[in-house]
Amino acid sequence: MARSDWKRPTTFPLSPGHRRIRLLLSYDGSGFSGWQRQKTERSVQEEIEKALFKMIGEHVRVQGSGRTDARVHALGQVAHFDIVNQRVPAEAFAIALNQRLPHEVRIIESSQVTDQFHARFTSICREYRYFVKEYAHYTPFDRGRVCRVKRFPPIDLLNAYAAYIVGTHDFTTFAAAADQSESKVRDIYTSHFSFEESQWGGRLLMYTVQGNAFLMHQVRSMVGTMLQLGEDLEPPEEFGRRLEARDRFRAGKTAPPDGLFLYRIDYDDPQ
């Protein structure tokens, strides 16, 4: 699908007298209802906006590259905000915000960008990683950061499922019922499983997926379906049939949020 078909805004003007600050940040999502501000629940967005008000006295709306669900983590989330304040150097926001944020949220870097940059709409690729571990090797330090299974399905079979995901597809099967996207079509560039050693002992099964955008619960639904099919040793074609069905009732059980990380956001030019 051509980038012109993504149906995204193309202009992001700054109000007079404002400047735009870009943040690269990470967070442990265990204690949050997700990225987006909620009426009654704790969110990452709200914590950053509160810290900004304490710092510069402005009520600022922070725009993230995308939403993460409750208990989903981020290693490379990107956000931006527009402010009137001209005194604080852009690079100083990272240090100053970290002094005011809860320990679960850290700003890695901050920089000033032009009105050509938008954290959500100028991104070209998002990467998620999902981690799975066998019960036998699960430790207290894995809590909240991996999905547990009795045993790993054959990785060759999992990768045969994952190969069906690459390309431009309608992912209705793997979208949450609450997803309100106008189109369920997404471009997926990379989709594969691999093993890596856990620092706490044992092996981690890691699923990596890269795409232009993702539907609500899409990654977790795809992972849950592939793990379920792999456990039953279903042929690769079965996953393909479920994808093509465009029927969310054909998806398997959605994998838990604990093992999911927003790993990286790529841009043509972050400035």
Which residues fall in each region the model found?
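Structured-RNA-binding interfaces characteristic of tRNA pseudouridine synthases
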Residues: 2-271
